[in-house]
Design a protein with these regions (language model features):
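A conserved short coil-to-beta-strand element within the FAD-binding core of flavoproteins
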Residues: 133-140
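A general structural signal for well-ordered alpha-helical segments in protein cores
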Residues: 52, 56, 115-116, 171, ...
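Helical element adjacent to the flavin cofactor pocket in flavoenzyme catalytic cores
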Residues: 110-132
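A conserved beta-strand/loop capping segment in the N-terminal third of enzymes
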Residues: 58-115
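A short, basic/flexible loop-to-alpha-helix module at the beginning of a structural domain
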Residues: 1-4
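N-terminal Rossmann-like FAD-binding beta1-loop-alpha1 element of flavoenzymes
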Residues: 8-32
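Conserved FAD-binding catalytic core of PHBH/FMO-like flavoproteins
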Residues: 143-189
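Glycine-rich FAD pyrophosphate-binding loop
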Residues: 26-45
């Protein structure tokens, strides 16, 4: 009889950890998912994500894309500008690989809350994933594989002495959430010219 594979411990139930745990669980792997936050706290972050076509394929393969469609806002153009050189690059649907042109945009904006709500529901429903939210991480067995997905300032990485490096490239991005009520598309277009 073949030994059963070890349980995989995923530390961190944000988008990266939750997607990892779901992907492993869907493959039949036993997973223990830990996060010190509650489900409500995990969903409460005020942030949005730019979803690319590679992310779309991942979400499709995990069975999430269809259920996120109402929360996805497509963008069909991307205007990149360099203030130092006054250079400008415009991306549109024609710049995509042909396999990606039949979709609604060159990318999508997805709010954090609907993504996390769906991920947590799917994880809860997956019999291969044991969620431990807002409680101490269970002690992994000696042969457990541990995935540290506990953020950019990972306490796991720090505790294990795993070194890392980064490059400050002095670029930034400003995003804002704007609620539009009773404003027509033609009215918005008139102000763009």
């Amino acid at each position: 009889m073949a030994p059963s594979p070890p349980v995989i411990h995923v530390l961190g139930a944000g988008p990266t950890g939750a997607l990892t745990a779901l992907a492993l669980g869907l493959q039949g792997q036993r997973v223990v998912l830990f996060d010190p936050l509650t489900a409500s706290e995990l969903q409460a972050r005020s942030r949005a994500y730019a979803i690319t076509h590679s992310s779309r394929r991942l979400l499709t393969n995990l069975g999430l894309w269809h259920d996120l469609r109402d929360a996805l806002v497509p963008f069909r153009d991307l205007d990149l500008r360099d203030g130092a050189t006054n250079a400008r690059v415009l991306f549109g649907q024609d710049d995509l690989a042909s396999a990606n042109r039949d979709h609604d945009g060159i990318g999508w904006i997805l709010d954090h809350r609907p993504l996390m709500k769906l991920l947590l529901a799917r994880l809860e429903a997956n019999g291969n994933v044991a969620m431990h939210l807002a409680e101490p991480c269970p002690d992994p067995s000696a042969d457990a594989l541990i995935v540290a997905a506990d953020g950019p300032r990972s306490p796991t990485r720090e505790a294990w002495g795993i070194r890392h490096w980064g490059i400050r490239y002095r670029q930034g991005c400003l995003t804002a959430k704007v609620a539009l009520r009773a404003v027509s598309y033609t009215h918005l277009r008139a102000h763009e010219t």
